[in-house]
């Protein structure tokens, strides 16, 4: 999994929209599995996008639908499964994100952390090969954010998809990704393993990660 980090306004969300095929680049190409996303045929683009899963910023759940119907939505739109098969898969996925028993509730009736879990279940219900996570922990307290990161990690271990996480929050993130790219003013300023990024001497990288370093340093001290 790759984490795209950087300050607000660095270009993370714009890059994500390019990768998802929502924005056409002014120059350059977006290659996914060797296919040029913006120069391929409509049928090729459709087939490629059907392999995508997306956890949108804020969850983007349908307020008028129950948790069950939100998660079932991609299957009803993209698959030929029967309602019985859909029900079986949805309930299984909800159990895996620790939401058994919540299928009849509406988004307004559950917490922010639970809504993120519903959004994750919906993003992966059709077994995508590539999953895009847009600010998956924004608005959550540190403990809930960490639990979402761990849930993303366990889901990735189970399904083995390629994951791209866009975020400006690094708490608990570096323990679940393989590579990190830091964006600055629309360009990738640093790219490497979490360890390499943490040890970078690039001033912009060090400044961005200073709160993360301070937290780790404080957490590592023994209580008096």
Describe every region a protein language model picked out.
Residues 131-134:
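Catalytic Walker B motif of ABC-type/P-loop ATPase nucleotide-binding domains
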Residues 106-110, 114:
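Conserved ABC ATPase signature
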Residues 125-129:
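A short, proline-enriched helix->beta-strand linker immediately N-terminal to the Walker B motif
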Residues 20:
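Helix-to-loop junction immediately C-terminal to a conserved catalytic motif
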Residues 35-36, 83-101:
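Conserved ABC ATPase "signature" region
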Residues 142-144:
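Helix N-cap at the start of a conserved alpha-helix in ABC-type nucleotide-binding domains
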């Amino acid at each position: 999994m790759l984490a795209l980090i950087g300050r607000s306004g660095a270009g993370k969300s714009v890059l994500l929209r390019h990768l998802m095929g929502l924005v056409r680049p002014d120059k350059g190409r977006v290659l996914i599995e060797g296919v040029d996303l913006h120069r391929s045929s409509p049928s090729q683009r459709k087939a490629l996008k059907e392999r995508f899963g997306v956890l949108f910023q804020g969850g983007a759940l349908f307020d008028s639908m129950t948790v069950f119907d939100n998660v079932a939505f991609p299957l009803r739109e993209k698959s030929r499964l029967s309602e019985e098969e859909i029900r079986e898969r949805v309930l299984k996925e909800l159990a895996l994100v620790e939401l058994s028993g919540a299928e009849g509730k509406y988004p307004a009736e559950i917490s922010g952390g639970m809504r993120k879990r519903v959004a994750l279940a919906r993003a992966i219900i059709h077994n995508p090969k590539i999953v895009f996570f847009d600010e998956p922990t924004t608005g959550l307290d540190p403990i809930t954010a960490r639990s979402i990161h761990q849930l993303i990690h366990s889901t990735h271990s189970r399904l083995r998809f390629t994951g791209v996480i866009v975020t400006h929050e690094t708490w608990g993130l570096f323990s679940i990704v393989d590579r990190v790219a830091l964006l600055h003013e629309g360009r990738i300023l640093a790219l490497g393993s979490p360890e390499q990024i943490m040890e970078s001497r690039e001033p912009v990288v060090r400044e961005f990660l200073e709160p993360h370093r301070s937290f780790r340093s404080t957490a590592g001290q023994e209580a008096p």
